[in-house]
């Protein structure tokens, strides 16, 4: 969408698609959200500025958290697009052991019956998800509704457990762990001052 004579793009898949054209034309791309790992590595470009985060950072922190909590059998689940792939790779980098299983879903998927059946059969002690927005809302409701939260601890990034998701899901969010950089109700001096 045009904003004061500029174009605004969002999403890792979009950043990777339009980036080369913009870079070839020596046009700066300022990303307020997407930070595909490719643009921080092999495809790093002086015309790309990520003002938020690199995609895999939150997920790497979650992997480290899962290691510290000593989860022994962890399954991971994310949509099959660049940010989802970065999520799983970041988690695996932070987690000290190999993951039990990796599942990539369709981007925008809302029905997780097949994935829940697979999880029930695998019986992991923890599940890491990257399912932002409606995907996360539906998955968490279905996960808890299927009774899987009684035996499997769910862990996710802030994108899968932000205020909007919590508001939409409600009580089934209780007990979920998430990694995020900030929330308005963090009880520490820096957050309260902000």
Specify the residue positions occupied by each region the protein language model found:
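Extracytoplasmic "Venus flytrap"/periplasmic binding protein-like
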Residues: 1-8, 12-31, 41-43, 122, ...
């Amino acid at each position: 969408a045009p904003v004061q004579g500029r174009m605004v793009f969002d999403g890792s898949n979009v950043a990777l698609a339009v980036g080369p054209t913009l870079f070839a034309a020596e046009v700066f791309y300022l990303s307020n959200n997407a930070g595909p790992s490719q643009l921080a590595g092999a495809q790093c470009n002086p015309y790309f500025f990520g003002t938020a985060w690199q995609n895999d950072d939150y997920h790497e922190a979650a992997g480290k958290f899962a290691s510290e909590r000593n989860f022994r059998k962890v399954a991971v689940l994310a949509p099959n697009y660049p940010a989802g792939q970065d999520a799983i790779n970041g988690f695996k980098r932070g987690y000290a052991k190999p993951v039990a299983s990796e599942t990539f879903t369709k981007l925008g998927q809302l029905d997780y019956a097949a994935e829940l059946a697979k999880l029930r059969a695998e019986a992991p002690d923890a599940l890491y998800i990257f399912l932002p927005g409606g995907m996360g809302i539906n998955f968490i409701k279905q996960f808890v509704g299927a009774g899987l939260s009684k035996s499997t601890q769910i862990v996710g990034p802030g994108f899968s457990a932000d205020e909007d998701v919590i508001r939409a899901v409600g009580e089934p969010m209780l007990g979920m762990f998430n990694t995020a950089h900030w929330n308005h109700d963090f009880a520490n001096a820096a957050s309260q001052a902000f």
